[in-house]
């Protein structure tokens, strides 16, 4: 369900990653060349013209790798009206098949202003590999959420990981958030649809717009959550410090954050440095799940040109608030 908008935004992110010498990744020189920079504008023009991306344009997008094959995705029965943009699909865990949820993917288009000026559109129309991995992790470790208040930050158009917590754990409360209003309207629809089926284990599941750099958004929920989690939210320079601050303020005194993100040059390390300065204790894990590690090793061994560890393999970071 990859969108033209997501591909355009992702290609720009990849291009920016390749331009920054401070990122310190040996692979960056291969990411972007002058022709690929030009391709970014081809992608944007495709968005404006509402055309399908051709194979060449898809190849240069960071979004070209789509999944670790942790969920089966099948088209669901039409949930909304014909006027509503989007396709309803059923996400079912491959490893824990009793857990399944209906989500709506946005198949409509965003306008130019959405692409260029909205708060982080990267998660607005697709589920990124890191979100998929976080969702799988939540199912595998559902016991850690028992009787706790949980918040997902930057969950995009579906907040899939937070939804998995709500259907698998005996959780006290789940709040699904993103900084983009269109994303949260879609999440509202997903919650309403699935409430009708009785799939949630808690009645206290809700969503709201939460921008990490907005004092009002953060202060209203200060000290409320036992666990805060996010996936692939570390690469935007202008929001990284705000994300660390928001996590710290949203957590209770002994709270923890569960973060999945690829290295993306030096952006993962930059976030870790900010978190340490903010007083968090850190635990980093590269091998946190055998099937994911095996799939990762297989892709590396194959030398696939659609998969790049620096951009696609999520590391696990556990932050513990130490006061």
From Swiss-Prot:
The keyword Transcription does not apply. Its EC number is 2.1.1.60. It catalyses: [calmodulin]-L-lysine + S-adenosyl-L-methionine = [calmodulin]-N(6)-methyl-L-lysine + S-adenosyl-L-homocysteine + H(+). Transmembrane segments: none annotated. Keywords: Cytoplasm, Golgi apparatus, Methyltransferase, Nucleus, S-adenosyl-L-methionine, Transferase. GO terms for cellular component: Golgi apparatus; nucleolus; nucleoplasm; protein-containing complex. Residues 1-31 are annotated as: Disordered. It comes from the Eukaryota. GO terms for molecular function: calmodulin-lysine N-methyltransferase activity; heat shock protein binding. Detected in most of the tissues examined, with the highest expression in the brain and muscle (at protein level). Catalyzes the trimethylation of 'Lys-116' in calmodulin. This is Calmodulin-lysine N-methyltransferase. It comes from Mus musculus. The lineage of its organism: Eukaryota, Metazoa, Chordata, Craniata, Vertebrata.
């Amino acid at each position: 369900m990859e969108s033209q908008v997501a591909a355009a935004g992702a290609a720009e992110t990849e291009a920016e990653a390749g331009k920054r010498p401070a990122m310190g990744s040996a692979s960056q020189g291969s990411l972007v060349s002058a022709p690929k920079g030009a391709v970014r504008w081809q992608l944007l023009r495709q968005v404006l013209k509402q055309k399908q991306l051709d194979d060449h344009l898809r190849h240069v997008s960071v979004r070209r790798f789509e999944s670790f094959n942790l969920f089966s995705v099948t088209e669901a029965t039409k949930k909304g009206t014909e006027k509503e943009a989007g396709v309803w699909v059923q996400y079912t865990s491959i490893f824990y098949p009793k857990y399944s949820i209906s989500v709506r993917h946005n198949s409509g288009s965003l306008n130019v202003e959405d692409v260029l000026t909205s708060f982080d559109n990267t998660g607005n129309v697709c589920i990124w590999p890191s979100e998929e991995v976080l969702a799988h992790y939540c199912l595998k470790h559902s016991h850690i959420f028992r009787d706790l208040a949980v918040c997902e930050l930057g969950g995009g158009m579906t907040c899939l990981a937070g939804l998995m917590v709500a259907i698998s754990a005996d959780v006290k409360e789940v709040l699904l958030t993103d900084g983009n209003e269109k994303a949260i309207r879609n999440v509202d629809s997903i919650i309403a649809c699935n409430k009708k089926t009785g799939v949630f284990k808690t009645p206290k599941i809700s969503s709201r717009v939460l921008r990490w750099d907005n004092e009002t958004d953060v202060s209203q929920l200060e000290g409320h959550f036992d666990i805060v989690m996010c996936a692939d939210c570390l690469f935007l320079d202008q929001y990284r410090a705000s994300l660390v601050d928001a996590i710290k303020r949203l957590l209770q005194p002994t709270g923890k954050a569960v973060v999945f993100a690829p290295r993306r040059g030096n952006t993962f390390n930059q976030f870790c440095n900010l978190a340490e300065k903010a007083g968090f204790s850190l635990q980093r894990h590269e091998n946190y799940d055998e099937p994911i590690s095996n799939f990762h090793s297989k892709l590396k061994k194959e030398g696939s040109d659609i998969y790049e560890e620096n951009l696609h393999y999520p590391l696990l970071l556990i932050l513990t608030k130490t006061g």
